[in-house]
């Protein structure tokens, strides 16, 4: 075990390599560029590959191709680049391609605030592509978690054959803290079919089929069209229903294993629901409010998606407070679920600055 002092983006790169990532394709964009710089420097040392593409469309396409070539692959970007990736991210869902996309969020829309923090891409990571699919998205709030959650993202991607998002922001990406580089970390690798050439690489009777890859003797056919068990196009209603339901259900039926959170005093009259950088402020505000005699708790979402409906439905709080560095995105998910609460309060903040504890306290005290 080693302890190092580093930037969040650097921790992300270290976590990726620890997880077994051996391919990175990207296009420089503030505030994520340090991830690309670190991967360009470190991947060749471990036999990996770095390629700077012409844009973010090409970047995610290269990542998908590398994954089907048998490599653990990732890219990193920010809001404008994330928008460009959405079509190919949809292709990755349909082809069940394991990969990791790190989004260091900045202020938008459009070019927005390249050097300032935001959480404005949270709805996009869930609904950015068309069609029916489920998402796994992690929200780190520290440099340590940039390292840990990147490893977790690769494990989820490999286990469930799905693109996984690490939804950080400029604050976490650029802050510097100590990071414990653990020696004994579980690393999950994708399963491959035992049969070659593998007549049915997409069997409908398996929730998560093994993944054949190019160059290893498998019969591999990949298409974004609705496809049958062989991977060949078949747009019949029956085939589409079986395929898409399986793609959706492999996440829905495993949500209890996927969903991660932390919290305190969930039976309180006032509960904060938070994620990412604002979680740091929430912990200060909760402590201050308790010192004033209030019954306060919090839930921090580690996985924002799949959304923890069952957890939030159990809350008995009269007041649920949702701080976000946007004008309300996850707030609407919380409002949808927390029907028992008398109030669901959004404490929004844009402009690139993190909430201050007193702002959250005022939302509670009125």
Curated annotation (Swiss-Prot):
This is 2-oxoglutarate synthase subunit KorA. One of its GO terms (biological process) is response to oxidative stress. It is an enzyme of class 1 (oxidoreductase). The keyword Cell division does not apply. The keyword Oxidoreductase applies. One of its GO terms (molecular function) is 2-oxoglutarate synthase activity. It holds the Pfam family PFOR_II. Heterotetramer of the KorA, KorB, KorC and KorD subunits. It comes from the Archaea. Keywords: Oxidoreductase. Disulfide bonds: none annotated. Its EC number is 1.2.7.3. It catalyses: 2 oxidized [2Fe-2S]-[ferredoxin] + 2-oxoglutarate + CoA = succinyl-CoA + 2 reduced [2Fe-2S]-[ferredoxin] + CO2 + H(+).
